[in-house]
A protein has these predicted regions:
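PLP-dependent aminotransferase-like
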Residues: 1-37
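Conserved active-site segment immediately N-terminal to the catalytic lysine
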Residues: 86-98
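Conserved PLP cofactor-binding pocket of PLP-dependent enzymes
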Residues: 228-244
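Active-site phosphate-binding strand-loop segment of PLP-dependent enzymes
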Residues: 22-79
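Active-site C-terminal subdomain of aminotransferase-like
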Residues: 98-185
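PLP-dependent enzyme catalytic core of the Aspartate aminotransferase-like
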Residues: 241-275
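Conserved PLP-binding catalytic core of the aspartate aminotransferase-like
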Residues: 193-224
Length: 275
């Protein structure tokens, strides 16, 4: 988001926390109180770098108390985590056709306060990011301003039907949460610890430290698991070596059991070769 603001020539300040800590709402309040020129606050809900789930409810409260606009990046949480948009003071929430929606990537969508959207007319700093113009075109013609991503829209419609058939966001969240719980449990049995503590661990993706005294590379582990039908993510959020495993998509506890079994086989095979 800071890169977007930089390229658009928007004055901004960055409040960072370490990857394993959530932004502090009181600190946000202090920053806003210290600088009345700040008009908008933007933050990520689910941070896929680490798997942490930020407390947007607490931050939204202090932002609204100070009359500022609150923007939430929910690219990797919308559809998989319940987000009471109005109750949490969110003015703009942005997500994507894929991730927890379980469609395919190709377009993003925004839920916005209508009055703020209308007030943004003529203020866009780029053609492609002119949200007001896109909204007005949709209102008049029901289409994109440029080439419509027809296949992605059809996939999105099917994904929304499947979300409803599953039981909605609550049911999908239960599945993701169980995937995450089982993953952490099985990894723990192999001596592999999660990077994020349970208080702030989200259900979307889980980051793990490498096992202690391991001498294998991520590439070796990745290729072993990939050759057997699964893929994991690299991770580098601290000085320590980490890797990530996603819990979302058409993934069920039996898939988690399988990938953990593959991890166990890899560790046993590698340790045997080392010895």
């Amino acid at each position: 988001m800071a890169d977007i603001a930089e390229h658009a020539g928007i004055k901004h300040q960055i409040y960072n926390e370490h990857y394993n800590k959530v932004p502090n709402a009181q600190k946000v309040a202090e920053l806003l109180d210290a600088d009345p020129a700040v008009t908008h606050v933007a933050m990520v809900h689910s941070e896929t770098t680490s798997g942490i789930l930020n407390d947007i409810e607490a931050v939204g409260k202090v932002v609204k108390e100070r009359g500022r606009v609150f923007i939430v990046d929910a690219m990797s949480s919308f559809g998989g985590v319940d987000i009471p948009v109005k109750d949490w003071g969110i003015d703009f929430i942005i997500s994507s056709a894929n991730k927890c929606i379980q469609g395919v990537p190709g377009f993003s969508f925004i839920i916005a306060r209508r009055d703020l959207l209308e007030a943004s007319a003529g203020k866009a700093r780029s053609l492609s990011l002119d949200l007001y113009d896109q909204w007005k075109t949709m209102e008049v013609d029901g289409k994109w301003r440029f080439t419509s991503p027809t296949h992605v829209v059809l996939a999105f419609a099917q994904a929304m039907k499947e979300l409803e058939d599953e039981g909605g966001i609550e049911a999908r969240n239960r599945r993701y949460t169980e995937n995450n719980r089982l993953l952490i449990e099985k990894m723990g049995e192999m001596g592999i610890r999660p990077y994020i503590d349970s208080t702030h661990q989200g259900p979307i993706i889980t980051t793990f430290f490498y096992p202690e005294e391991c001498h294998f590379t991520f590439s070796q582990m990745y290729e072993y698991i990939k050759d057997r039908g699964y893929a994991i993510y690299p991770g580098k959020v601290t000085e320590a070596e980490t890797f990530r495993i996603g819990n979302i998509g058409e993934i069920y506890p039996e898939d988690i059991e399988k990938v953990c079994a593959l991890m166990k086989e890899f560790l046993e095979e590698y340790n045997h070769e080392e010895n």
